Every structure is written in structure tokens, then in C-alpha cells.
Amino acid sequence: MILQVLLLVLGFLMLVKGADWFVDGASGIAERFGIPQLVVGLTIVAMGTSMPEAAVSINSALKGNAGITIGNIVGSNILNILIILGITAVITTVAVQKSTIWIEIPYMMIITVLLLVLGKSGNQITLSEGVILWVAFLLYLGYLFYCAKKNKEEVVEEEAKPMWKLLLATILGLLLVVWGSDVTVDAAKAIARGLGISERVIGLTVVALGTSLPELFTSVSAARKGKADIAIGNIVGSNIFNILFVVGTAALIVPVEFLPGFGIDTVIALGAGLLLWVCIWRKRALTRPAGIVMLIAYLAYFCVSDVVFL
């Protein structure tokens, strides 16, 4: 068991470092080709911080570990909102753009409902339903590029890294994420079997926390640097990416089982999104008291879930 825990930690470290290298390399390459920084931030960075969830969930789907696939995504989305934004808000007040309140967060909640409906309709996400999620993902990308074009900012010239270094970082980062996901899934499955608990619980808690580390580091770092407004955009973007791209891609490869307990967990994820919206819609900011409320909400969710009955 000790070996499996060490392997799980190693897998998490590989995921975090791999995602970091991928984001740096891919962002640098995109900027070298003149792609606006806003587009890079809204797409590559948000997707890059979600790479651990993507790799672990798709890998677990291929290995037939349904509990880890959906559990990781739903658990990560709950944790991203309540824990990561909660911690960030406790550190500093988080400013929120108007479009985030009225477009992006509502869209996140709509696709959460879509995931629930698709999952409960046949207790699995099928190929055709994966296509639906991908269409919704492409619509979201179209919206992002529209916003980028509308709000294009002047790019500040900086000393560029050699192209070979950017390519090397991108390739090594991607390989490290893929390898780390394999180590993480195998270790998590072994721990679940050893402790006699379900893969769903492992996916919702331990794996969700580990794969959310990039979002946590990005948001807390932004808050400390006085750029807390980046935090909500990163989290909301990552949550949308998790549902539409990750689950959608996994379903295109193999039908993804939607276990009965995931219905409640998905409703909790929807509730977390609604709580976030309620906390920010008046002042267009996420304050410290709101952050504390969100942390308490996650603690309550954790306590009333079947985790306490393990």
C-alpha cells in the first residue's frame, strides 16, 4: 500500500510538471506565430491546467474504470469552484468580468445539466452523446475567439525562447502528462481495491484533488501577484473544458459508464456553480466572506457524502 501511495504522488507530480511544460511550450509557439495572448490564455492555458483531468479520465475510460472517469471530472469541478476559488478569495478579493457572470458561468451550469441528462438517460455517455458534447465545445471555442477578436490587446514584445526549446517543452510535457496519468490511474485503482472502497469515491476525492493541482497553483499564484481576476476565468474555463472536451473525447473512444451515484454528485457540481454566481453577481467580485462560505460548503459536501462511511 505504501508503494501505491508513493506511485500516486509520483503520478500527480508528473501530471503537474508535464502540464506546466506543455503550457509554457505551447503558449510560446502560439505567440511566435502571432496568435493574440488573450486567445492563448483562454484556450491553451485553461486547457493546459485541465490536461491532468483529461489524461486521467480518458486513460481510465480506456481501462474500463468508469468510477474514476466521471468521478474525476465531477469531483474536480466541485473542488475547483468551492476549494480553489474559496482559497483564492480568502487570500484576496477576486474581481469578476461582466461576461463571466452573465455568459460563462451560466454556460458552465447549462452544460453541467446537459451532462446529467445525458448520463441519466442511459446510465452511460455514448458515442452520439460525445458528439453532442464536442459540438458544444466547438461553440464555446467560437465564443472565445470572438471575444479575443473583439477585445484584442497590443502584444508586448519579449525576448523569445528558441523554437527548439518550445517544441521540446511541449512534447516532453505532453509525454509526461500521458505517462503520469497511467501511473495515477493504476495506483488509484490499487489503493481503492486495497482499502475496499469504490473507484467513484477515489475519483471524487483523491484523484480529483491531485488533478486539480495545476488550477490551484495557477489561481493562488495569480492572487498573490495581484492578478486575481485571472482565477475565475481559469477555473470556469477549465470546468467547461472538463465536461465538454474530456468527457466528450472519452465517449468518442469508448462508452463512458455513468454510475447511479454520479447523479447526486453532478447536482452538487451544479449547486457549486449556482453558489458561485450568487456570491458574485451583485458586487462583481468574490470576497473573503464568500470564499469562507464556499470552503464550508465543500466541507459539508465532503461530510455528508459516502466518504465518511468508508
Residue ranges and their predicted role:
Residues 1-310:
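Hydrophobic alpha-helical segments, chiefly the membrane-spanning helices
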